[in-house]
């Protein structure tokens, strides 16, 4: 999709599968997740003659979830794999699906609305299919991806993982019980 997008004219359906700008200062207040490797969340593409948005590495451009065609393709991909017998999906980097000026671009209401639609779709067509949210957030933010039982059925608890190692190293349960108390 990206090769097609970068070779298509501005404003075309193909180009709009990704988030592009002429101004790399757009969303300037959004944190850069991998600061050791990326100087910006925007990377110049010499073919498209525009900057494309990536929340992680420059070789991982973000899809434009505001584009209904992108959403349609996601539904088709889910259907394809469910028809092949897959009954669970890890939804990677789920807090970062949408971009909104004036926000930190994390945990936005649009993300939850999309997840509700996707969950309703699989519940109707493929009952028993599960979604695992990969949301590297503090527990109170990550828990929101359960919705009211209408988003993801499971969720990683990222803060507990490094604390397990810390507890072993310190020979103390406190790092684990502390994060669960939060």
Task: Say what each PLM segment does.
Residues 88-90, 128-132, 153-155:
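Structural preference for beta-strand elements that scaffold enzyme active sites
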Residues 135-182:
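Noncatalytic carbohydrate-binding groove/subsite architecture in carbohydrate-active enzymes
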């Amino acid at each position: 999709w990206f090769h097609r997008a970068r070779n298509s004219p501005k404003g075309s359906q193909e180009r709009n599968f990704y988030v592009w700008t002429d101004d790399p200062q757009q969303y300037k207040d959004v944190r850069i997740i991998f600061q050791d490797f990326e100087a910006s969340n925007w990377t110049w593409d010499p073919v498209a003659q525009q900057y494309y948005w990536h929340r992680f590495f420059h070789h991982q451009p973000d899809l434009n979830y505001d584009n209904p065609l992108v959403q349609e393709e996601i539904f088709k991909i889910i259907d394809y794999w469910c028809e092949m017998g897959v009954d669970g999906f890890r939804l990677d980097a789920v807090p970062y699906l949408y971009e909104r000026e004036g926000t930190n671009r994390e945990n936005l209401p649009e993300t939850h609305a999309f997840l509700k639609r996707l969950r309703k779709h699989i519940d109707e067509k493929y009952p028993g299919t599960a979604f695992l949210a990969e949301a590297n957030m503090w527990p109170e933010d990550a828990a929101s991806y359960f919705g009211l039982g209408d988003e993801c059925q499971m969720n990683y608890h990222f803060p507990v993982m490094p604390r397990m190692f810390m507890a072993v190293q310190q020979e103390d349960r406190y790092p684990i019980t502390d994060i669960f108390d939060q």
